[in-house]
């Protein structure tokens, strides 16, 4: 797994975005999230428990706490009430991407290089649209995948352009859980240290 800096992640555009009503909601709430120091991962309307608006987000450092979810919910709820993009009663659900997260930005592929991912493309790539394997390298235009179960006659490695990507998600493994928990712990420790430093500066003024 590779580290990426907060600066590199700030305002980085998503490779995979919504359509229709989901896109309208995303356009409304994303500026609010950015101002708060969060990144939008995904918006999805679901018929679960009536009608549920699922908003997946994270801090620029990749962390997300229960308190963060509550903060985001309180911030975007009144904005959605004013803009009123949904003409039915719905339940707002804010969550983190989770360990087996959707991969929606180039930095996601860089950060989780070496881990297993499953993805779909909007066009045929190397004779198929569905892939599963390890991310072995990432460049400006796409990533290289080493298939863990190549079909007979297929090369194990395949290059997938970001422009062809329609969906991608990490596959849960023991290695992913270990690395994700380690990264989360480091990021939260760094944030706490930074907040303590800022508090000391304020006290000295």
Swiss-Prot record:
Question: CDD domains under this entry?
Answer: YlxS_C
For the keyword Cytoplasm, the answer is: yes
- GO CC annotation: cytosol
The superkingdom listed in its UniProt entry is Bacteria
Q: Which InterPro entries is this protein grouped with?
A: Ribosome_maturation_RimP (IPR003728), RimP_C (IPR028998), RimP_C_sf (IPR036847), RimP_N (IPR028989), RimP_N_sf (IPR035956)
Report the protein's function.
Required for maturation of 30S ribosomal subunits.
Q: What is this protein called?
A: Ribosome maturation factor RimP
Question: What organism, scientifically named, is this protein from?
Answer: Rhizobium meliloti (strain 1021) (Ensifer meliloti)
Gene this protein is translated from = rimP
